[in-house]
Amino acid sequence: RSRGLGDVYKRQDGDGLEFILLKDGAKTGIKFRGVPNGHEFTSLLLAILNSDGKGKNFPDESICNRVKALNGSIHLTTYVSLTCTNCPDVVQALNAMTTLNPQIHHEMVDGAINQAEVDALKIQGVPSVFADGKLIHVGRGEFGELLSKLEAQYGINESLTEKTVKRYDVVVVGGGPAGASAAIYSARKGLSVAVVAERIGG
């Protein structure tokens, strides 16, 4: 059963329908409780590629270092629907963090076959992310947003963070259509570009 949820729920519906990813016989920390088809099939493929070092969806080095600096052992559970279009982004972001930091463990749960658990936790929307039994996020979420919530929850090891200064030719503020176009145009001209935005797309 999921750590931190034992006092709330005794598993019933989807018992046994789960699997974990291994690399060279060792656990990666990534677990799927349910069958990751539908929108979550890509999450499974990316988890396999990332675990093998071939993934392409990692953020830049400075963000990766923030993930590695998170304190303590972190157990995350994300409840999803296989028809949810916002769920894969959250699942893939947390799986990527799990690959980067061996102290993070992430479990994707298909709410449709674990309905009793969903009811017991009073989950109203998906994706819903629990950190050691505490609800920390509901709905659409970007990598940086989720990381900030984990930093607030667990803190960071300052000795593992790197204070680096990077120089850019162009800094674009805003990730809307105009900002994205400006960034793409500048990058195509061979310039080093940084985009400062809460999310791409406005």
Which positions does each model-derived feature cover?
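Typically the conserved alpha-helix immediately C-terminal to a functionally engaged Cys/Sec
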Residues: 3, 88-100
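Structural micro-motif
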Residues: 11-30, 118-132
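Long, charged amphipathic helices and adjacent flexible linkers at domain junctions
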Residues: 54-69, 158-164, 169-170
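Extreme N-terminal leader/targeting segments of oxidoreductases
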Residues: 98-106, 112-169
